[in-house]
């Protein structure tokens, strides 16, 4: 199985493997897909950056996949960090470093590429960033309903980015984009068939062998591919930044890309990310004779608990991301994993989940991302026209959902000392009634 890292926040999620495979989504792994990913043994497609030597025609990638050069000639190191992943590669006298991350508080991702000429002669290189967009933001629709999804997209080239639109007449802000800062776009492609070619794959795409031809998609499969031609003298380094995102206006896209024309922008954002995660994880550090145990407890187990807390297990390489909301039981359980590290975050999420408890004491099996306390439908409307069942696919409650409030609230108060929390009033999910935290827990066992 791929070695995976999780990047982002509740607003924007990205999953990336040690070979740059993976996918991205806005808010919902089910209904907010941006990058296409096929759940198979090949870990493809992903966030690909191709490098081509224009003199020899030889090409490779900034991660081992997708080109998969012979490892006797190609060296690569992948480092998964907290909120970022870094690939360092060396081949044919050229070294590269690609850093992938989602800036703190932003709803897009950055691929920061550094290329250095380690040889003793000038090198002419073509660098190409590649992203394969979903045709539909719903994962199942994109993979299955081809009679529809192959006829709703179109790509445009806007100077330094590819813009994909979906049903643009009815939804002019539905697009996704792949943009470039730090270099001129010398060629582009927005059509998958034109980029990959017939009977080819990501390892030998026609668009890399022959160069991009400016083909755009109109009702087939959309991609974003941006090509830049550079010349590096011996020892010279070039920095480029690709930016990927969705649901942005043209003005917003232009402003976002322009941020990365400024020197030091990437370094500042990475420092901010690292400081954020250290501020959380440093709240508990264990020290035993076993360094591997310390590293697991202090860093990776804690980091994974935070990601699970943020995404509520909604997306991974095992779980395809089909749940469009927070599972009640899972989310209340997951809060327990970060109480000792971030009690303020835990409290906020406990309040949110209490507001998804109905007046009969049960929890809504699926809590929508746009949940509105006091205004929600619920499974008690269990006739054939149940609005809640149609919206969520859950026609009934689960017996143990709300019971998980007992240990979670108890652990929060034990850790924080905030016993006054029991007296705070919170709206129930289904009408205007309020109850104290203590009262709501009391109803949970009924």
What are these model-derived regions, one by one?
Residues 1-329, 343-352, 356, 382, ...:
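Anionic coordination/interaction segments
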Residues 50, 326, 331, 335-445:
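Aromatic-rich carbohydrate-recognition surfaces in CAZymes
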């Amino acid at each position: 199985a791929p070695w995976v890292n999780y990047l982002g926040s509740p607003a924007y999620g990205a999953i990336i493997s040690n070979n740059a495979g993976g996918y991205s989504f806005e808010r919902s792994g089910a209904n907010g897909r941006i990058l296409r990913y096929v759940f198979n043994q090949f870990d493809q497609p992903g966030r690909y950056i191709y490098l081509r030597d224009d003199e020899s025609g030889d090409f490779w990638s900034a991660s081992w996949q997708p080109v998969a050069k012979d490892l006797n000639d190609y060296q690569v190191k992948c480092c998964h960090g907290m909120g970022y992943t870094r690939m360092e590669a060396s081949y044919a006298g050229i070294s590269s470093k690609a850093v992938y991350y989602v800036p703190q508080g932003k709803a897009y991702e950055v691929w920061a590429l550094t290329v250095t000429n380690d040889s003793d002669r000038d090198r002419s290189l073509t660098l190409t960033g590649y992203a394969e967009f979903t045709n539909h933001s719903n994962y199942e629709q994109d993979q299955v309903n081809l009679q529809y999804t192959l006829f709703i997209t179109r790509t445009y080239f806007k100077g330094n980015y590819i813009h994909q639109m979906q049903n643009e007449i009815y939804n002019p802000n539905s697009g996704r984009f792949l943009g470039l800062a730090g270099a001129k776009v010398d060629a582009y492609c927005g059509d998958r068939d034109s980029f990959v070619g017939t009977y080819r794959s990501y390892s030998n795409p026609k668009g890399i062998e022959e160069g991009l031809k400016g083909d755009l998609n109109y009702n087939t499969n959309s991609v974003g591919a941006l090509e830049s031609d550079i010349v590096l003298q011996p020892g010279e380094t070039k920095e480029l930044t690709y930016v990927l995102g969705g649901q942005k206006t043209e003005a917003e896209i232009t402003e976002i890309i322009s941020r990365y024309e400024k020197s030091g922008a990437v370094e500042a954002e990475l420092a901010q990310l690292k400081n954020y995660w250290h501020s959380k994880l440093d709240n508990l550090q264990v020290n035993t004779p076993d360094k591997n145990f310390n590293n697991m407890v202090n860093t990776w187990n804690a980091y994974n608990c935070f990601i699970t807390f943020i995404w509520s297990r909604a997306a991974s390489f095992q779980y395809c991301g089909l749940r469009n909301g927070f599972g009640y039981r899972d989310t209340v359980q997951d809060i327990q994993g970060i109480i000792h590290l971030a009690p303020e975050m835990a409290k906020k999420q406990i309040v949110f989940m209490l507001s998804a408890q109905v007046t009969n004491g049960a929890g809504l099996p699926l809590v929508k991302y746009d949940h509105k306390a006091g205004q929600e439908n619920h499974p008690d409307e269990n006739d054939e026209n149940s609005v809640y069942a149609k919206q969520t696919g859950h026609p009934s409650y689960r017996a143990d959902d709300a019971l998980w409030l007992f240990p979670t609230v108890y652990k929060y108060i034990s850790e924080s000392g905030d016993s006054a929390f029991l007296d705070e009033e919170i709206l129930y999910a289904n009408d205007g009634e309020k109850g104290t935290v203590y009262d709501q827990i009391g109803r949970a066992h009924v």
